[in-house]
């Protein structure tokens, strides 16, 4: 959530309507004044959950000046973080900026951090707050184990795993969800529940009752001609793409296609990050379609790693990628679609999931 989004969420005036910017902000100010003067105290939520984005240096400091949390969660940073090109010192700068979120917490607060992320782990020794760690690593307070996908024939039904705490082991099933990153999200949620004295069983029951995939965030969709579309079109980064591709390795039976777009804002890490993605794609998919100039690097690396020329296709635009995909896909294929938001791969998802095709 950007700088303007946080105060809007706090006052509850965040629903954007189609109106000129001036009138929108006048409406927000009027709503805020009304809330201060007339709203009942019990009308405001007891717990407010805010996303603090670190697009550039200083973002977290600014957001903390608006609202300092009692619970801070750092889910992932990665060795090559998103928005790295906005930071003069690269990964180190991103770690330092995101670390401000948990460093601002006091002794009576709680930090929830991912034990699997090497960059996140560098922050642990500097945190003053009570710290709860989650992940697949041994020693995690909430540990993720036995991750796989449930299949019905050649169809992916969802993600299944176990959450292990000091006192219990709980099975979890997330229907219509693909990436194992969702397991981390659930584990983090259980940790946050613990910060509010909610036991793991009750927290998990509440999560499972309401958990649903969001468009562009690893939802499993029904595609044309009995295909399954893994919609990760909203954005892409090295860590997220690696997770998505590796998740494909637990799917057996159907042919796997990846439509991968540029990963943007990586700065000096751009070439190597795309090479690494191409090498991984060569091991994980049967057909690779790349979209964008940077994604060409993926295609070339996949070829260099032994992928057949007939299985690698290079495209400039999302429209070109769609045309190639429609020529090469077969009935029953599993198709991963992922790229940075500005590449526009959501249009490929929309076309491939049209009813009646």
Question: Where are the regions that the model predicts?
Answer:
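ATP-dependent carboxylate-amine ligase catalytic core
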Residues: 1-96, 180, 202
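Residue-level signal for inorganic ion chemistry
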Residues: 6, 51, 63, 75, ...
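A conserved, hydrophobic alpha-helical segment in the catalytic core
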Residues: 45, 66-79, 121, 172-213, ...
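Conserved C-terminal guanine-recognition region of P-loop GTPase G domains, centered on the G4
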Residues: 97-101
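ATP-dependent carboxylate-amine ligase
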Residues: 107, 126-130, 166-167, 188-357
């Amino acid at each position: 959530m950007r700088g303007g989004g946080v105060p809007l969420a706090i006052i509850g005036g965040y629903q954007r309507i189609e109106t000129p910017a001036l009138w929108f902000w006048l409406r927000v100010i009027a709503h805020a004044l009304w809330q201060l003067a007339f709203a009942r105290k019990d009308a405001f939520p007891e717990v407010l959950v805010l996303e603090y984005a670190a697009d550039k240096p200083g973002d977290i400091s600014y957001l903390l000046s608006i609202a300092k949390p009692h619970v801070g969660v750092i889910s992932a940073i990665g060795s090559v973080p998103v928005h790295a090109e906005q930071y003069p010192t690269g990964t180190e700068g991103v770690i330092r900026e995101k670390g401000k979120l948990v460093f601002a917490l006091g002794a009576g607060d709680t930090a929830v951090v991912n034990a699997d992320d090497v960059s996140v782990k560098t922050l642990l020794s500097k945190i003053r707050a009570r710290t709860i760690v989650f992940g697949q690593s041994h020693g995690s307070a909430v540990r993720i184990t036995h991750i796989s996908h449930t299949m019905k024939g050649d169809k992916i039904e969802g993600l299944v795993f176990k959450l292990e705490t000091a006192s219990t082991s709980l099975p979890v099933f997330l229907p219509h969800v693909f990436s194992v990153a969702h397991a981390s999200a659930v584990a983090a949620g259980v940790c946050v529940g613990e910060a509010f004295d909610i036991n793991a069983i009750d927290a998990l029951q509440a999560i499972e009752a309401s958990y649903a995939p969001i468009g562009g965030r690893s939802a499993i969709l029904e595609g044309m001609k009995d295909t399954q579309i893994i919609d990760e079109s909203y954005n892409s980064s090295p860590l997220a793409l690696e997770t998505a591709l590796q998740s494909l390795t637990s799917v057996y039976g159907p042919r796997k296609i990846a439509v991968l777009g540029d990963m943007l804002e990586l700065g000096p890490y751009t070439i190597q990050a795309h090479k690494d993605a191409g090498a991984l794609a060569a091991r994980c998919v049967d057909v690779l379609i790349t979209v964008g100039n940077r994604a060409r690097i993926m295609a070339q690396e996949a070829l260099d790693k032994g992928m057949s020329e007939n299985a690698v296709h290079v495209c400039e635009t999302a429209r070109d990628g769609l045309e190639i995909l429609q020529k090469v896909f077969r009935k029953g294929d599993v198709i991963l679609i992922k790229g940075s938001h500005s590449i526009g791969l959501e249009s490929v998802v929309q076309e491939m999931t049209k009813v009646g095709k």
